[in-house]
Design a protein with these regions (language model features):
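Ubiquitin-like/PB1-type beta-grasp interaction modules and other compact soluble beta-rich domains
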Residues: 1-64
């Protein structure tokens, strides 16, 4: 199925979850914010299955000062 991740179309397996997508990009769940179809996904909902045409934004937190 096809989804849009940070503005780019990507093909992912059917039934992939938010958690699996985070793992696919080797991201640490505690260091990212995920938006699915313009709604923030709380970490306890990362087992939500993605659907064809979904739009995902991944924001990575970085420290600095």
């Amino acid at each position: 199925m096809n989804v849009k991740v940070n503005g780019d179309f990507r093909e992912i397996p059917d039934g992939e979850t938010v958690r699996a997508l985070v793992a696919r990009y080797n991201l640490k769940p505690e260091k990212v914010a995920i938006e699915l179809n313009r709604r923030l996904v709380r970490s306890e909902k990362y087992d939500t299955a993605l659907n064809d045409g979904d739009e995902i934004e991944i924001v990575t937190f970085v420290g600095g000062g």
